[in-house]
Amino acid sequence: MSHAKKADAALNSPTSAASRASDSRASALMAAGTLISRILGFVKSWLLIAALGLGSSVTDTFVNANNLPNMVFVLVAGGVFNAVLVPQILKASRAPDSGADYISRLMTLAVLVMFTLTALVTLCAPLLIQATTSGYGPAQMSLAVTFAVYCLPQIFFYGLYALLTQVLNAHGAFAPAMWAPIVNNLVAIGGLGLFVAIFGASAGNPHTLDNWGTTQTILVAGFSTLGVIVQTALLFIPLRRLKLGLRPRFGWRGVGLGAAAKVGSWALLTTVVSQLAFLYVMKIATIPGAVRANAPEGSPPIAGNAVLEIASQLYFLPHSIISLSLATVLFNRMAKASLDNDVRGLRAALSNGLRTSAVAIVFSAIALLVLAAPIGMFFSAGKPQDGALLAITLSILALTSPCLSINFMMTRVFYSREDARTPFYVQLALAVLNLVGAFAIQFLPAEMIIYAIAGLYSVGNILSVLISAFFLRRVLGHLDGPRIINSYIRMGYAGIGSALTGGVVLWLFGAYRADGFLWHNQAAALLSICVAAPVMLAAYVLLLRVFHVEELRDLLRPLLARFIRPTSGESTTTAPAAPSSVPTAPAEHVRRDAAREELPTGAVPAVSMDTGLLPRISGGFDSESFRAAPSAEDVGEGLSRPVGGGHSSTPHYGDEDTAVRADGRRSLLTVFRDWLWAPPSELPQLGRHTYQGRSGENPHFPSDLR
C-alpha cells in the first residue's frame, strides 16, 4: 500500500475518528470546567466586594492574608512540583504497577514535607505578616494575623491538590482537576452569602476594623480555606477509581528526586526569583490600605491592594483562557521541531501562536480599556468613587496585556528546546525591575501607589517581550517579524474601530458624565456592559473580515469543530479548484494539506499584502507555499524565468516578499524593516529570483521541509 493510501486510511479509520471525537469531548469538558470556574471566581470576588467594600481596610487586609498561602506554596514548593515531581510521576506511571509503589512513596514524602512546612509557616504568621506588610497599625496588624492563621493551612492542601492532579493527569484523568475548583468557589460563595445575610452588605452596613468579630472571620476566611479543603478532597474519588492501591510507604533512597532536581534547577530558580520580587511588590501595595485605615473620616478614597487584585484578575483572564490553551497545544509542535532541529518549523509554530492568539487578546485588551468604567462600577459595591479607582487601574494594566501573552508564547520556544536558563535570565531582569521600581514607588503619595504598581507591571510586560525577542533571534535567526506586524496592524485597525463603536455606546449610557446613567448603580453598569460588549465584538469581527485577517479563521476553526461535525457524505476539507493556467498539485499534496487543515496549529495561512499603513510589508510564506508570478515559462525542471529572459524587473530579496516601488527600488521603510528583523545571513541579496514552480516543489529546499 502506498504512503498516500496509508495516510488516507489512518485519517478515515473508525478508531482514529473515535479517538478524535473522544479527545474533542474531553477537551470541551475541560474547557467548560475552566470557564465555569473562572465565572464563579468573579462571582466570589463580586460578593466579597459587596460584603466588605472595595475601598475597605478590612478587604485589603483579607486579600493580602488570603494571597499568602498561594505565594508561599509557589515560592517554596511550586517550582519543585512543576520541575521535579511531575516528570517523575509521568515516568512512574508507565511502570508495570502503574507507578503505585513509587507514587505511594512520593505522596508520603510530600504529605510529610507539606504538613511540616504548613505548621511552621502558620506558627510564624505574625512574622510573615510583618514581612509582607507596611504601615499597619495595631488593630489592622491583629486582624491580618488572625486572617493569616485561618488562611495559611491552605498551603498543605494546595500541595496535596497539585500532587493528586499530576497523578490523575499521568493516568489520563484530566477533567476532575478542572471541575474541582468549581466546588471551591461555591463553598466560598456560600460563606460570603451567609455573611451578607447575617451582617448585611457594606453599602448599608460598613464593616470596619472596629466592628469586626470572630464570626465574620469564620464566614470570610474560614470558608475560603474550607473551599480549598473540599476541592482537594474531591480528587480522592477519581483517584480511588484508578485502583492504584496507594498507601503510606517510607524509604525514599533511590527514588531519583536528586537527579530530577538538578535538571529542574533553573526552573526552580526562576520561580524563586519571581516570587521574591512579587512579595516585595505586594508589601509596597499594602501602604495605601494602611494610610486609609489611619486617615480621618471623609478623606478622599485611596486605591488599595484589593483594587489591584480585582484589576489583575480581570486583566489576566483572557491570557489564562486563550493564550495558555493555545500555547499548550502549540508546545507539542514546538517540541517536535526542536527535536528535529527544524528552525523553520519552530519559527512557524511561534509565528502561528503569536498571530492566532492575538486575534482574541487584542480585542480583550481593547474591551478592558473601553469598558473599564462600567466594569469598575459593577465591582464597586455601588460606590462610583471606588469604581473609578478600579477603572483607572484596569485601564493601565489593559494597555500592555497582549505583551503578557506574547512573552508567554516566546518562552514556550525555550522550554521546547529544554532551555530553562534563558527564561531565568528574563525573569531575573523583571525581578530587578520590580524591586527597583517598587522601592521608588513607596515614596509616592499613597493615592498614586497602586496606579504606579500597575504601570510597573505594564513596563515589565514590554521589557519581557524585548528581552525574549533578543534571545530568540539568536535561536531562530529572525522571528517572522514582518508577517506578525502585518497581522497586528490589521488587528489594531479592527480594534480601533471596535473601540470607537464601544465608546459611542457608552456615551449613550452616560459613561463620560459624573451623573450619567451608568454611574447610578451596579445594574446600570452591568446593562451597559451587556450592550456594549456584543456591539464591540460584532464590529471587531466585521472589521477583521474587512481587513482580511486570516488568523480569525485559525482561531475559530478548533472552536467550531467541537460543535460542527461533517456528515458521513461530506469531506472535512475541500481543496479549491486550481486555475486552468496553473498545474494541479499532485494528490499527495492535496491529502497532506487536508490533513494539516484538521490541525489548528499546523496551518500557516496566507497573509494579505495591504495593511494600509505599511503596504506590502509581508506575504504569506512558508516552505510549502510559494507565490507564483503571473507570467512565466518553465526553464528546466521546476524552475522558471520571466518571459523574454533576463532579470526580473522586480527583484526578490531574501526569503520574504519585500515592499518595492514601481521602479523596482526598495523604500526606506523596507530597508529599515530588513535591518530590524533580518539577521545578517538573510539580508537582501540582489539578483536572486522567486521560485516560479508549483507549490511545495522548490528544489532549493530539502525534501523534509517541503
Task: Name each model feature, range by range.
Residues 1-593, 597-598, 602, 612-617, ...:
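Membrane-embedded alpha-helical bundles of multi-pass transporters/translocases
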Residues 610-706:
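Long, low-complexity, intrinsically disordered segments
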